[in-house]
Amino acid sequence: MSDPTIRPQSELTPGDFTAAENPFALFAEWLAEANKSEPNDPNAMALATVDPDGLPDVRMVLMKGYDEHGFVFYSHIASQKGRELAANPKAALLFHWKSLRRQIRIRGTVTPVTDTEADAYFATRPKQAQIGAWASKQSQPLESRFAFEQAIAKVTARHLIGDVPRPPGWSGWRITPSRIEFWHDRPFRLHDRIEFRRDTPDHPWTKTRLYP
């Protein structure tokens, strides 16, 4: 049985997205459509980093903001991704929207967000998620689930009243893209692909159409 959330190829209309000149504007259009069609987390993206031995790591994270300066996500600074980004501040992202038969690939350099940005976003999180950020030692060995629940209980007891401040080891990163590629599924694997490249954030984008 086919998935009713996935648009059949016969209903796909490629539009004229290959005529776009601003990749951020096109990203905003595609994300808006994904917000309507994706059943879960349209802002989910695969984040790829590299360890000191050159081996890649990839995991799903949630994009929590974007503008023409880049794409933002948050996590623990001492996590595996945080350590790898500190050693090699370059990353790749992938958005895949199955319901739309589209994907966007992004490569770029990574910089930490400001404390002001991190504080502002942390304040919007549910209190239980804020407590979890204090209780978790992300990517470190965990003796048992019970040990984690004990840590959560201790943090909860400390913050029964009032706001929960942002942990000093929890913050965010911004990926400033040097390359953004848009891919749209077409019948018989004759897909549409366009790629935007720039040498630095101050340079204009160069657009190229790619073979599928």
From Swiss-Prot:
Cofactor(s) the record lists: FMN
Top-level taxon: Bacteria
Gene Ontology MF term list: FMN binding; pyridoxamine phosphate oxidase activity
Catalysed reaction, written as an equation: pyridoxamine 5'-phosphate + O2 + H2O = pyridoxal 5'-phosphate + H2O2 + NH4(+); pyridoxine 5'-phosphate + O2 = pyridoxal 5'-phosphate + H2O2
Keyword Acyltransferase listed: no
Keyword Transport: no
InterPro entries membership: Pyridox_Oxase, Pyridox_Oxase_CS, Pyridox_Oxase_N, Pyridoxamine_oxidase_dimer_C, Split_barrel_FMN-bd
Pathway: Cofactor metabolism; pyridoxal 5'-phosphate salvage; pyridoxal 5'-phosphate from pyridoxamine 5'-phosphate: step 1/1; Cofactor metabolism; pyridoxal 5'-phosphate salvage; pyridoxal 5'-phosphate from pyridoxine 5'-phosphate: step 1/1
Keywords: Flavoprotein, FMN, Oxidoreductase, Pyridoxine biosynthesis
GO terms under biological process: pyridoxine biosynthetic process
EC numbers: 1.4.3.5
Pfam families: PNP_phzG_C, PNPOx_N
Cofactor binding note from Swiss-Prot or TrEMBL: Binds 1 FMN per subunit.
Residues where substrate binds: 64, 121, 125, 189-191
Leader sequence residues: none
Cysteine pairings via disulfide bonds: none
Binding site for FMN: 59-64, 74-75, 81, 103, 138-139, 183, 193
Biological role: Catalyzes the oxidation of either pyridoxine 5'-phosphate (PNP) or pyridoxamine 5'-phosphate (PMP) into pyridoxal 5'-phosphate (PLP).
NCBIfam families the UniProt entry points to: pdxH (TIGR00558), PRK05679.1 (NF004231)
Assembly and binders: Homodimer.
Family statement drawn from the similarity comment of this UniProt entry: Belongs to the pyridoxamine 5'-phosphate oxidase family.
Protein name: Pyridoxine/pyridoxamine 5'-phosphate oxidase
Organism: Rhodopseudomonas palustris (strain TIE-1)
